[in-house]
Amino acid sequence: MDLHNIREDYSKRELSEADCADNPIEQFERWLDEAVRAQVNEPTAVNVAAVDGRGRPNSRMVLLKEVNSEGFVFFTNYHSRKGRSLDAHPFAAMTFFWPELERQVRVEGRVERLAEKLSDEYFESRPYQSRLGAWASAQSEVIPNKAVLVAKAAAVGLKHPLHVPRPPHWGGYIVIPDLLEFWQGRPSRLHDRIQYRLLDGGWIRERLSP
């Protein structure tokens, strides 16, 4: 397969410093709102990259479940590869990509586990079958076949026919950012890149060369 000529010339929008909020979280919320209104497919999907105890990088897609003044929240199995990596090295990089808008956002920062109360509250909001799955799946572990997983979920359902409590190995993380970059595709590969970096408790906004 020849990949050399697979390319797009971006021209839909531009990003100027005058259009950017002083606070990067506010800027992110603006762009996320525009992605939702534009009916971007899975606008909250984000790639999370981490480094494990051996220094090997790994990444995967998760769903952003909250953004607030503190940072970016997602939920997972703490015993999964990503959970073990984040516990070993509590830093992460996140990338949102909204091709319909020719935009991406990068986030870097320190990672903390979310308070158990907040993880409990979110878990209670999940569909019943999803809560069963959180108990049934030993995420990232090798299993002999799919039937084993289905049987485990059924067993959890028999044990908890009405209320499924949150497993202790499942909960949230928050990425507390110290760097965000907003990328807007432009013609001739002269893309707009506006970066915010945290310095002495305040945000510095600057333009990067594409």
Swiss-Prot record:
It comes from the Bacteria. The keyword Repeat does not apply. Keywords: Flavoprotein, FMN, Oxidoreductase, Pyridoxine biosynthesis. One of its GO terms (molecular function) is FMN binding. It catalyses: pyridoxamine 5'-phosphate + O2 + H2O = pyridoxal 5'-phosphate + H2O2 + NH4(+); pyridoxine 5'-phosphate + O2 = pyridoxal 5'-phosphate + H2O2. It holds the Pfam family PNP_phzG_C. Its EC number is 1.4.3.5. Pathway: Cofactor metabolism; pyridoxal 5'-phosphate salvage; pyridoxal 5'-phosphate from pyridoxamine 5'-phosphate: step 1/1; Cofactor metabolism; pyridoxal 5'-phosphate salvage; pyridoxal 5'-phosphate from pyridoxine 5'-phosphate: step 1/1. Its cofactor is FMN. FMN binds at residues 60-65, 75-76, 81-82, 104, 139-140, 183, 193. Binds 1 FMN per subunit. GO terms for biological process: pyridoxal phosphate biosynthetic process; pyridoxine biosynthetic process. Gene3D superfamilies: Electron Transport, Fmn-binding Protein, Chain A. Catalyzes the oxidation of either pyridoxine 5'-phosphate (PNP) or pyridoxamine 5'-phosphate (PMP) into pyridoxal 5'-phosphate (PLP). PANTHER family: PYRIDOXINE-5'-PHOSPHATE OXIDASE, PYRIDOXINE-5-PHOSPHATE OXIDASE. HAMAP family: PdxH. Belongs to the pyridoxamine 5'-phosphate oxidase family. This is Pyridoxine/pyridoxamine 5'-phosphate oxidase. It comes from Neisseria meningitidis serogroup B (strain ATCC BAA-335 / MC58).
